């Protein structure tokens, strides 16, 4: 059975994310622990955390991912931003442990002039300074690769893993990969792209996929998500991707838009159809 779910809201209490996931017929999921647009601490009390853990277990929904703040920049050469990013990430991994959540997902961020090599060194350094609780793993996510943002090349992911002492794993975002120039629009392209990822990084360290179609063509570095099968990756590419041997057992988390009358529930059902379930 495919593990597929959506990014759900914690409004009114973190446990509501589980109830929302069940409404969508999702069986795994992702949350923000707080508003991702500001520097803010997760505000989750013990009772809320227990309710979340109990509901997730009762409904069989998991694994879960906490997506880090959009402000976090692991690659930054600026000391103040580095410290804010480190503090934010530490609070995210601690919140994950409290909630019984397995993964914390993070973008590498932008080197903003430090250069690719310097930026990757900076990212590894921040990861090294984290005190990651047992049972929690940091996932580094692939990026669309615009500007000085790193993570758009598989080699960036592999290099950070080589340079950090932490046991990190990875999240591939299909829209980001496509935007960064990794074609996924045909079965042949999916085979080629995933073979390259396996060679450079290794599919055994792929813990999660953000499954999104793309509103823009391959290689544009433009990150705008589309409904599954309705963007430039398209139905053939999405079907090949979700049925690929490297992906079949990996949890799929949707970050698709809610527009044109199509919700997360529609996209989850679409994935199940593409999987023949």
Swiss-Prot record:
Keyword Ribosomal protein: no
Chain positions recorded as Zn(2+) 1 binding sites: 67, 107, 141
UniProt keyword annotation of DNA damage present: yes
GO BP of this protein: base-excision repair
Cofactor: Zn(2+)
Enzyme class: hydrolase
Alphabetized InterPro entries for the sequence: AP_endonuc_2, AP_endonuc_F2_Zn_BS, Xyl_isomerase-like_sf, Xyl_isomerase-like_TIM-brl
UniProt cofactor note: Binds 3 Zn(2+) ions.
Annotated keywords: DNA damage, DNA repair, Endonuclease, Hydrolase, Metal-binding, Nuclease, Zinc
EC annotation from Swiss-Prot or TrEMBL: 3.1.21.2
Catalysed reactions listed for this entry: Endonucleolytic cleavage to 5'-phosphooligonucleotide end-products
Entry binding sites for Zn(2+) 3: 176, 223, 225
Homology family: Belongs to the AP endonuclease 2 family.
PANTHER family for this protein: APURINIC-APYRIMIDINIC ENDONUCLEASE (PTHR21445:SF0), ENDONUCLEASE IV ENDODEOXYRIBONUCLEASE IV (PTHR21445)
Function field: Endonuclease IV plays a role in DNA repair. It cleaves phosphodiester bonds at apurinic or apyrimidinic (AP) sites, generating a 3'-hydroxyl group and a 5'-terminal sugar phosphate.
NCBIfam families for the chain: nfo
Name of protein: Probable endonuclease 4
Record organism: Haloarcula marismortui (strain ATCC 43049 / DSM 3752 / JCM 8966 / VKM B-1809)
Lineage: Archaea, Methanobacteriati, Methanobacteriota, Stenosarchaea group, Halobacteria
Gene behind this protein: nfo
